[in-house]
């Protein structure tokens, strides 16, 4: 590791320079290089890059971990930490810790996820809107957020205001969803999880909320199901709903046909992949933090991906261990798992996780100080300030961590075990059990050296099932825990590792390999007469196909004497024989038995004190009965949650409702523009300059867009204004102009006349062209693709182009599929989730 770096004086590097250097670091893997530079390289608030390769990032992280380690006995040094991180070989921080540790340019949290809520039920408008503001404040600092809606009174119940009756859950789902869509996090929207108890009288409305794919597009939704409901549904009995859901004297009660509602959950999951299901009694029964409910640790919701159930104002940071790196002599008959090295590294990973909590507390303190010093009125700052103080309190009290794993599929293949078989599942459970015991051993050791989390009480935990399994597996460890306590209230999870696995060049999380071989297409140069045409697209463009291989399938070939120099020209028949001989044969995402996979998840879950985020990917032609079988099996075998995704279930883009057309051109219906249409404001950076986009909407869909540089002396719009109207005005001489109108905080209408005159003519003309395409109804995904394909000479215009793409992507509904091939697995299964193009097959994401 280099020793002459000066952390206080970073040197700026260009994007292309960083990509080229990182491509060499990743042995020519340009996808891994571009993902790392785009998402994880050190950047300032203007997007300037200060790291060339992941080595620089790992040195940055190692230096900060060493600084914290020096506070405690037996510290790890920088070199020791760096070697664990280097080349993503052993220990991989995920998301926030990778981008934020040692980043002094931005006041942002290191936490991946948060949950918010009220200490006491609060279903007033004040309580509902405070939740909305807290959600936005967390998302602006890169946090994913979850919260529960079960405290909101059901539809039709009386309220003591002029409305007389409650609107119920769904309008507030839409409100929280819209807030998520509006908050930019490094070019993408925030991530949100909304949950509701099945016991709530509005549960059916909640379950149906996303059947219309134009609704609640900025949130994942999951229904919290209790054991009583499951027993009633499977037995065909009645189930009682009430509000408040935990009250001994509810204000409202109703009985329902549990089987009918269960069938609706299954149908909607089959049809649109939502809602997800959380088995809430299992979560609470297994939750160690809930042993401290009297201290505020009552679990109420999960983070957006579902792997961390949390209490209000608690947070978590994620880190994954690369299991493949512990296989000695991989892909040979002598292959074995190095449990001794694994145990040592689990202890070090837990120390690093605890150090990251200290680093997070420093970041939170900076955020609190920044808010306190802001010039805005105290009453404006109050909610955000109190929010971060609550987060600081919960982080100090519990010191929660999120240690997980990745490369499960590759580890099993390297050992000669076929994913999904009983032998492979048994070994996977053995590894997870070892991880759990060593993580608990490490946290007990840290409690002795550093002190236990401040509310530890062994008596409160003694009946917890997870603690019981620890006690039974290792009585001596349990005795030490009773004596010294634990450093951390809860520690383990298995989170999605989409982009993480791209950089470690392994399978993701506990998932199998998607395919060991897939095909990519390359456009043929018209002058290349010898190219073999494999595909011609709608525009007449010709493509050739070539094979792309999973990194570790190639390692298996090399370890077993195959001539890998033949790979680019190999015949399909010979390649199929090679695949059939490999441990990946019959063990891909499409090969394994889906119900067996859920059973494997349930067995591993016994040794994970939080939860596991897994989506069961199903082919398009599966029946609803199979989805029901997957969900029922998940409950029976102890899973804490389950989500399914049936291929193509959300295919297509939204079609506006039919409206009276003003005219038709060449068979194309064109909607007449009203004089005034609603508009959203999207602000973005073009280089170092502040730019703005006005997006005019028809039926919630972009109809026109005007963009340019913000000139405050000519066009001042308060930062908190994000909505208004674009008004088309016809002058006496026949010319037209566009005005922007908004309502300020005092309720007065403000109009900015002729916004076109305020923008550079070149940008205005490009925006007019894009608006013309939007008005003719081209799907937003196609418009974004069209803009992405523009090759413009000016760097300023190219930066502007990225801002326009970002603005329009906010209006692409989750689940909207594109014809794009996934750059990781090569499948045409790319769909938009939270504004990010995500592969529904392998988990690759352009954003997250």
Ranges and model annotations:
Residues 3-5, 15-27, 111-345, 349, ...:
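Active-site cavity-forming subdomains of large catalytic enzyme subunits
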Residues 100-110, 114-115, 125-148, 183, ...:
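Conserved phosphate/anionic-ligand binding catalytic regions in large, soluble enzymes, centered on
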Residues 225, 286, 291-293, 303, ...:
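Terminal amphipathic helices with adjacent charged low-complexity linkers/tails
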Residues 243-245, 345-392, 396, 418-497, ...:
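Internal maturation/activation junctions in enzymes
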Residues 822-825, 839-842:
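Short cysteine-rich clusters marking metal-coordination/redox-active sites
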């Amino acid at each position: 590791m280099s020793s002459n770096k000066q952390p206080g004086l970073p040197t700026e590097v260009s994007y292309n320079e960083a990509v080229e250097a990182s491509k060499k670091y990743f042995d020519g893997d340009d996808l891994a290089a571009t993902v790392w530079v785009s998402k994880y390289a050190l950047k300032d608030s203007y997007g300037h890059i200060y790291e060339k390769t992941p080595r620089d990032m790992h040195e940055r992280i190692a230096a900060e971990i060493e600084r914290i380690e020096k506070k405690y006995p037996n510290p790890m040094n920088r070199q020791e930490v760096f070697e664990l991180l280097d080349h993503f070989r052993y220990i991989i921080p995920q998301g926030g810790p990778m981008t934020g540790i040692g980043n002094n340019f931005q006041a942002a949290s290191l936490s991946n996820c948060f949950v918010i809520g009220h200490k006491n039920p609060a279903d007033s408008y004040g309580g509902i809107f405070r939740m909305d503001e807290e959600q936005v404040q967390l998302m602006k600092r890169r946090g994913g957020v979850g919260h529960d809606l079960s405290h909101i009174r059901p539809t039709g119940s009386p309220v003591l205001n002029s409305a007389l009756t409650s609107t119920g859950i769904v309008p507030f789902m839409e409100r929280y969803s819209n807030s998520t869509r509006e908050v930019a996090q490094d070019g993408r929207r925030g991530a949100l999880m909304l949950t509701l108890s099945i016991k709530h009288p509005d549960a059916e409305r909640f379950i149906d909320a996303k059947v219309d794919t134009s609704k609640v597009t900025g949130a994942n939704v999951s229904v919290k199901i209790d054991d009583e409901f499951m027993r009633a549904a499977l037995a065909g009995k009645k189930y009682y709903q009430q509000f408040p859901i935990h009250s001994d004297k509810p204000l409202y009660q109703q009985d329902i046909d549990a089987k009918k509602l269960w069938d609706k959950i299954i149908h909607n999951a089959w049809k649109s992949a939502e809602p997800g299901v959380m088995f809430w009694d299992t979560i609470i029964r297994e939750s160690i933090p809930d042993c401290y409910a009297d201290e505020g640790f009552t679990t109420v919701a999960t983070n957006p991906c579902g792997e961390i159930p949390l209490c209000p104002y608690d947070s978590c940071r994620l880190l994954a261990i690369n299991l493949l790196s512990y296989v000695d002599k991989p892909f040979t008959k002598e292959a074995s798992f190095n449990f001794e090295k694994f145990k040592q590294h689990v202890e070090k990973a837990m120390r690093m996780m605890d150090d990251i909590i200290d680093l997070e507390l420093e970041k939170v303190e900076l955020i609190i100080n920044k808010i306190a010093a802001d010039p805005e009125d105290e009453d404006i700052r109050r909610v955000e300030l109190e929010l971060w103080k609550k987060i600081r309190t919960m982080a100090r009290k519990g010191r929660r961590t999120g240690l997980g794993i990745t490369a499960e599929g590759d580890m099993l293949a390297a050992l000669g075990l076929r994913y999904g078989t009983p032998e492979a599942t048994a070994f996977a459970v053995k590894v997870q059990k070892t991880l759990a015991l060593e993580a608990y051993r490490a946290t007990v050791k840290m409690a002795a050296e550093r002190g236990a989390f401040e509310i530890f009480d062994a008596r409160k935990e003694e009946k917890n099932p997870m603690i019981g399994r620890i006690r039974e597996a290792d009585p001596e460890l349990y005795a030490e825990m009773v004596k010294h306590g634990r450093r951390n209230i809860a520690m383990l999870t298995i989170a999605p590792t989409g982009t993480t696995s791209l950089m470690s060049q392994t399978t993701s999380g506990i998932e199998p390999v998607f395919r060991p071989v897939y095909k990519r297409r390359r456009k043929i140069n018209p002058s290349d007469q010898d190219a073999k045409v494999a595909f011609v697209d709608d525009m007449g463009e010709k493509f050739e196909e070539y094979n792309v291989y999973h990194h570790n399938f190639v390692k298996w070939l090399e370890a077993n004497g195959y001539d890998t120099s033949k790979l680019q020209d190999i015949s399909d028949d010979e390649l199929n024989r090679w695949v059939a001989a490999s441990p990946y044969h019959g063990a891909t995402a499409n090969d394994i038995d889906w119900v067996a996979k859920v059973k494997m998840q349930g067995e591993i879950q016994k040794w994970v004190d939080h939860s596991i985020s897994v989506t069961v990917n199903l082919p398009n032609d599966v029946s609803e009965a199979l989805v029901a079988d997957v969900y029922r099996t998940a409950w029976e075998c102890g899973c804490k949650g389950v989500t399914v995704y049936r291929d193509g279930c959300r295919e297509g883009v939204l079609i506006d409702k039919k409206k009276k057309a003003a005219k038709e051109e060449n068979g194309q219906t064109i909607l007449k523009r009203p004089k005034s249409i609603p508009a959203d404001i999207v602000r973005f950076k073009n280089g170092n300059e502040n730019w703005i986009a006005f997006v005019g909407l028809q039926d919630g869909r972009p109809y026109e867009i005007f963009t340019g540089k913000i000139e405050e002396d000519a066009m001042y719009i308060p930062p908190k204004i994000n909505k208004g109207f674009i008004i088309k005005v016809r002058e006496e001489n026949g010319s037209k102009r566009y005005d922007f109108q908004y309502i300020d905080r005092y309720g007065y209408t403000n109009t900015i006349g002729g916004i076109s005159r305020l923008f550079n003519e070149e940008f205005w003309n490009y925006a007019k062209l894009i608006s013309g395409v939007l008005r003719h109804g081209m799907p937003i995904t196609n418009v974004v693709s069209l803009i992405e394909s523009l090759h413009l000479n000016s760097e300023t215009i190219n930066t502007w182009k990225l801002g326009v793409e970002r603005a329009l992507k906010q209006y692409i509904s989750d689940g909207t599929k594109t014809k794009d091939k996934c750059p990781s697995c090569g499948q045409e299964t790319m769909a938009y989730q939270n504004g990010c193009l995500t592969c529904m097959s392998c988990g690759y994401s352009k954003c997250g």
